[in-house]
Swiss-Prot record:
Catalytic activity: trans-4-hydroxy-L-proline = cis-4-hydroxy-D-proline
Name of the featured protein: 4-hydroxyproline epimerase
GO function terms (MF aspect): 4-hydroxyproline epimerase activity
SUPFAM superfamilies xref list: Diaminopimelate epimerase-like
Means of activity regulation: Inhibited by iodoacetate, iodoacetamide and by high amounts (10 mM) of pyrrole-2-carboxylic acid (PYC). Not inhibited by PYC at 1 mM.
Residues annotated as the enzyme's active site: 90 (proton acceptor), 253 (proton donor)
Domain of life: Bacteria
Protein species of origin: Brucella melitensis biotype 1 (strain ATCC 23456 / CCUG 17765 / NCTC 10094 / 16M)
Organism classification: Bacteria, Pseudomonadati, Pseudomonadota, Alphaproteobacteria, Hyphomicrobiales
Oligomer status and interactors: Homodimer.
Length: 333
C-alpha cells in the first residue's frame, strides 16, 4: 500500500480556484502536450480525481501540473486538470498558474515579463506585470477562436426550446443569449443554471457534431455560457459558465470570454483592436481584446487576449493514500 504525496500551491483567479501541482506529478510519455494528456488520462487519472474531487477538492476545483515544454518556442508546458477531466486550455487556470509559478520561482522566463506556454491546445503567449515579488496582472494571448455554429435548437428543462450559438475559445461553448424562452442570467438562480446545463450539454452533443477542424482530440461541447446584462459599470457583458458536472465558474472564464469574443466578431460586433470587458457571476472582470483576425482551416477566426489577476491562498501537501477508501475522490449527487 502506497501513500502518494503532492505539493500544491493553492490560489484563485478572480474568485475561481486554481491548484497548481508543483511536486509529485507523474512523468508522461508523448511528443506533444496532447499526447502527454492522453497518457495522463489513461494511466494517472486517479491523480486528477484525487486532487480535484472531495474530500481533497470540491465541485468547482480546477488545477494544473507543470512539465518541461515539448516545443522549443515555449518556456514551460501546462496540463490543465479539473473535475470534468483534462482541458485543452483553461484561461483562468493559465492566469493563476502563471501568477503562482512566477511568484514561487517555479519557472524562469527567457524574457522577463513574457512567457510562452505549451498547452494541449497549442502555444499560449503570456505577458505579465510584476511589482516586486508579486504578479499583479497576466494577459494571455489565446489560441485562435472561432464561431462554430449558429442557432442550434435544443430543448431546455423548464424553459422549453431555445437556440444557442457554439463557439470555440480553447474549448467548445454553447452560448445562450436572451430570446423568447430565456431572458437574462440574473432572472434565474445559480442552482437552476446548474440543473439545466448538463442536460443541455448532453442533448447538444447527442444531436450535433462538434469537431475542431485541426485538433482531432477536441471533439465535444464541454461548457455552457449563459449571458446577461452587465452590472459593473466597466463591463460590456456578463456571463455564468457551467463546467464539469455541477460547477459555475466564479471568474469570467478565459476560454469562454475568448469564445464570446469570437462569436461577436463573427457577427460584426467586434473588430481587431476592440476591447471586451466580461463580468462574472460574482462581479469580477476579465479584460478581453481582439488582437487580430485569423483563420482556422479556412474558417474566419480571431486571436483573442484576456487579462486578469490571481492571488495565492496557501501551500498544501496532499496525500493520496491507498488505504483511504476515498483515495481517488468522490462526488456527492
Amino acid at each position: 500500500m502506497a501513500r502518494h504525496s503532492f505539493f500544491c500551491v493553492d490560489g484563485h483567479t478572480c474568485g475561481n480556484p486554481v491548484r497548481l501541482v508543483a511536486g509529485g506529478g507523474p512523468n508522461l510519455n508523448g511528443s506533444t502536450m496532447m499526447e502527454k494528456c492522453a497518457h495522463f488520462l489513461a494511466e494517472y487519472d486517479w491523480i486528477r480525481t484525487g486532487l480535484m474531487f472531495e474530500p481533497r477538492g470540491h465541485d468547482m476545483m480546477s488545477g494544473s501540473i507543470l512539465y518541461p515544454p515539448t516545443r522549443p518556442d515555449c518556456d514551460v508546458a501546462v496540463l490543465f486538470i479539473e473535475t470534468s477531466g483534462c482541458l485543452p486550455m483553461c484561461g483562468h487556470g493559465t492566469i493563476g498558474t502563471v501568477t503562482m509559478a512566477i511568484e514561487q520561482g517555479l519557472v524562469t522566463p527567457k524574457t522577463p515579463g513574457k512567457l510562452n506556454l505549451d498547452t494541449p491546445a497549442g502555444l499560449v503567449a503570456i505577458e505579465y506585470e510584476q511589482d516586486g515579488q508579486y504578479v499583479e496582472r497576466v494577459r494571455l494571448t489565446n489560441v485562435p477562436a472561432f464561431l462554430y455554429a449558429e442557432g442550434l435548437e435544443v430543448e431546455c428543462p423548464d424553459l422549453g426550446p431555445i437556440k444557442v450559438d457554439v463557439a470555440y475559445g480553447g474549448n467548445f461553448y454553447a452560448i445562450v443569449e436572451p430570446q423568447e424562452n430565456y431572458t437574462d442570467m440574473d432572472d434565474y438562480s445559480a442552482l437552476q443554471l446548474i440543473a439545466w446545463s448538463p442536460v443541455l450539454r448532453q442533448r447538444l452533443n447527442e444531436k450535433y457534431k462538434f469537431q475542431h477542424p485541426e485538433l482531432p482530440d477536441i471533439n465535444r461541447l464541454s461548457h455552457i455560457l449563459w449571458t446577461g446584462k452587465p452590472k459593473h459599470p466597466q463591463a460590456h457583458a456578463r456571463n455564468a459558465v457551467f463546467y464539469g458536472d455541477k460547477a459555475i465558474d466564479r471568474s469570467p472564464c478565459g476560454t469562454g470570454t475568448s469564445a464570446r469574443m469570437a462569436q461577436l466578431a463573427a457577427k460584426g460586433k467586434l473588430k481587431p483592436g476592440d476591447e471586451f470587458i466580461h463580468e462574472s457571476i460574482i462581479g469580477s472582470l476579465f479584460h478581453g481584446r481582439v488582437e487580430r483576425a485569423a483563420e482556422v482551416a479556412g474558417r474566419p477566426a480571431i486571436v483573442p487576449s484576456i487579462a486578469g489577476w490571481a492571488r495565492m491562498t496557501g501551500y498544501n501537501t496532499i496525500f493520496i493514500d491507498d488505504r483511504d477508501p476515498f483515495a481517488h475522490g468522490f462526488s456527492a449527487a
